Amino acid sequence: ARQLVPAERIIFNGPCKQERLLTVYEQGGILNLDNPTEVEQLCETVRNGAVPSEHTQVGLRINFDLEAQCPDETTAGTEVSRFGICYENGDLKRAIDQPGEAGIAIHGIHLHTSTKTRSTRVFAALAGMAVKIREEYGLSLSYVDMGGGYFGGQKVTGKPTMEEYAACICGELRK
């Protein structure tokens, strides 16, 4: 796929990508940082002058207490997610401040979850959190990357369609 799509149109996601992190950054790809270690690694590399700070779009994968907003709908329940940068414990604030100090702008937010119900309420909560973070930290975002747990591929009575997910998410993002 990489041969057919320019790097700046590929969002590079996921944990454990340290080895590829700088390659993607140097090629101008969209890079979602998954944890505080990846944030620090990229900031240190930029501070050392290995790559320019404006070289690519950087996003942050964020986790938060979704269960509090959507009780009994998440697969993680009340457990802290092992993926993403935690909003509640201050890690997110540090993950936004550190790149700023290194001259790296945060261009995006990545929110990904797994659900038991696949309801639109979960995705409304994710989109609402994206808006809250954008406003709270004064971010100028180019993208919000949301995934996980969509019901799709077939029409099933009582399950949301892709159009319903899109309407729900866009409605929250426009607020």
Q: Residue spans of the language-model regions?
A:
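Active-site-proximal beta-alpha core segment in soluble small-molecule metabolic enzymes
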Residues: 1-143
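Charged (often Lys/Glu-rich) extended helix/loop segments that serve as interaction or gating elements
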Residues: 168-170, 174-175
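Glycine-rich beta-strand-to-loop/alpha-helix junction loops that act as flexible
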Residues: 112-115, 144-154, 175
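Short glycine/threonine-rich loop-to-helix capping motif typified by GTGT followed
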Residues: 118-126, 153-166
